[in-house]
Amino acid sequence: MQRERMSKKKISQVHCIPSGDHILMTASSSKHIPHIRFYKAWKGNNRFCCGGRLIFGPDVSSLYLTSFLIGAPALTFCIRMLVWIKRGDPFFNYTVLASGFILTLLDFTFLMLTSARDPGIIPRNKTSMILEDDSDSSLTQSMEWVNNKTPNLKIPRTKDVFVNGYTIKVKFCDTCLLYRPPRASHCSICNNCVQRFDHHCPWVGQCIARRNYPFFICFISSSTLLCIYVFVFSWINLIRQPGKLWRTMSDDIVSVILIVYTFVAVWFVGGLTIFHFYLMSTNQTTYENFRYRYDKKENPYKRGLLKNVKEVLFAKIPPSQLDLRAMVPEEDDMTIASNDSEYESEYTSSVRYDTEMGGKLIKRDSPRKLPLPTRNLDDIKDISDNYDRSTTTREDASDRDPSFFSSQLDLPK
């Protein structure tokens, strides 16, 4: 009888898997649990390729359209240049052909570097710390609580930090269970909090943020140059032909189509390039540009033209906080649900409020306490201390990117 009772009991174990600067804690039975790659247990909406080595957004299929819009006219131009080579002046035409091919190759390279890499996703908080009403009075500084439906848990929805002498409010993300660092935002399409979030680009199928923004700048710049290149040399090929221009155009319809196509395209991609060069020169993101314009606030990240450009284009890209090929237990009790089922998490309140998904309320039958990720409050406080300095030392303090502040933990291979 005693052995039977012992066999019925399940001895629980805790598995701790570091993910970036977060620790995944999962409760499981003592029996062997199969492990899977971390990207297979991913709770966001991203799609993966090559065993988790490449990460895309949920709308990655738009890459086919973007590749076609770039590749089709570029290939047509190259084929047309081969025809012109046979008609004479091979050195000039070969040079134009080789330069166009290299520019197209660079454009596709920057497209993949933008779309197929981690844009700066902040790992979701997997630790839970339940606070009662009187457990920690230092966190009850706001009249607006995350737990507006959970009276036993008090979490201030916003925290004030100081960046370059300006007060910045950092918000609590109810989906990722963490306080977002300055300049970070939650992408409702990918369902992730992202460092220095600029926007979600449907043309590349990925968030544009801290770790891929320089490549995005190079991508749209090379696309603009490619449009101008094809436009100019298509005109040159028409002008170089003997006879009247209108007759030459009627005989070379392909070049005319390329001229019209690139003329229309350059207004879109060129305008986007100019806009982002303006954002880069003022050290703003697209999200901040519209927000500051609406709120009529001053940009706290301005450092001067040269320093702004250096920070955006030439600063060292921080390593990813994700190790998507790490092995994690297949059964994870402390799951944070994805966008489609985020309100079915094992750790949620009877009515959960999501600030990022439009404040949707979903009721559950059994009320549970919401896990509170307060570990990164100390990190955010460090940001406030580092940036609350005198004017003479602000430039030195602003050399570090406030959106990337946490230390990294190596995941098991």
From Swiss-Prot:
It holds the Pfam family DHHC. It is a multi-pass membrane protein. Its main location: endoplasmic reticulum. It is found in: Endoplasmic reticulum membrane; Cytoplasmic vesicle membrane. It catalyses: L-cysteinyl-[protein] + hexadecanoyl-CoA = S-hexadecanoyl-L-cysteinyl-[protein] + CoA. Residues 171-221 form the DHHC domain. The chain crosses the membrane at residues 65-85, 96-116, 216-236, 255-275. GO terms for molecular function: protein-cysteine S-palmitoyltransferase activity. The active site is at C201. Residues 364-413 are annotated as: Disordered. The DHHC domain is required for palmitoyltransferase activity. Belongs to the DHHC palmitoyltransferase family. This is Probable protein S-acyltransferase 3. It comes from Arabidopsis thaliana (Mouse-ear cress). The lineage of its organism: Eukaryota, Viridiplantae, Streptophyta, Embryophyta, Tracheophyta.
